[in-house]
Amino acid sequence: MTKKVILILISIFLLCGCNKETIEVEEKTETRKDYYPEAVTDIYDEYVPMLNTVTKLTYFEEEYSKVLLDGINDVLIKYHKLLDNYHYYRDDNDDLIKNIKYLNDYYGNEDGLDVSDELIDILSNMKKLMKLTEGYFNPFIGELIESYGSKFSNFPVVCEDIDTDLIDKYLNETVDYNDIDKIVEIDGNHVVFHKYKDIDKLSINLGAFSKGYVAERVMEYLSNSKETILLNEGTSTIVGHSDINRTWNVGIRDPHNKYSYIFALELSNNSSLSTSGSDQNYYLLDDGTVRCHILNPYTGYSENYYSIVTVLSESAMVSDVLSTALFSIEDSELSIDIIKAVENEYNVNVDVCYVSEYDNDELIVRTTLDRDKLLNKSTSILSTEVMDK
């Protein structure tokens, strides 16, 4: 097996429930190249960053193929346009693309609309994962997230929470995962986004899903290629492809020191890693309580059970969704039940690492991985507990 060690320090932020970040400070190589896909243009000729974040492809010069990179770029553009809930786009025939934003406009319209096979697949997986995570992945809390406005920041300040009455209002309008089939009804390629209760405005936001879903589509495109590619989306959802079983070591960032890491994990061929954390994009209360961007759909606030949650799986979509959902769950039995349900449904293996803070900046790690899978562990780790699945 050929191993190319790439050290990626993962920091995390989540904007509107979705965006996450990783900083790469890797061992340099003369042949390594980075490719950044171009921004996408909406119907008003405004530039939109690919997947609304920084997307990077790492490849090796000896294996360079412009045709391959162009093909990957086409896949990224196609699914960015479908998953975007903020912008309209046109296709090659100058027709409006029926994407998530287009579907949101049909909320409460009982006639529904016909959509592409690709959007049907997106919606079907959305519904399935909402049920499997028992609503901790909830793509209908966009209004709640937006009610926080600009409080979340990479340069946090002391703020007051938003009004509790406003949070209660949005919680009362939160979609119950048991009702998802009644709200988003799929019949072949026909979709009806039914009105829920008496809620005037309801929209789908797939920020905690989209990067992983797109990464899987890219891996499908690469399935028969011989090139080695590392796809880094928003620099938290990371997947690797290699025809020669090249592996990468991915360092999980220390929440107290953005230039250091607490341990590294091996990312094998065609596997994925996704991380969520509270150490960026947050604000502080007067008493020092951290309010981060990852909101619990059942309380309307962020939780402080963990500093970091990292999920590894063959499915980038699963890793992306679970890293967000598990962040808000303290009950380890419920977390394991959800992991098992997802594993059984998607026929994948899922492992998780929880990092919690202790006194004096010491960290406690709980993981379903064997201890020897945590590489280059930091001295800031007080203890490591292996969890049974």
Predicted regions and their residues:
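Mature catalytic core of soluble alpha/beta enzymes
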Residues: 2, 18-389
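Sec-dependent bacterial lipoprotein signal peptides
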Residues: 1-16
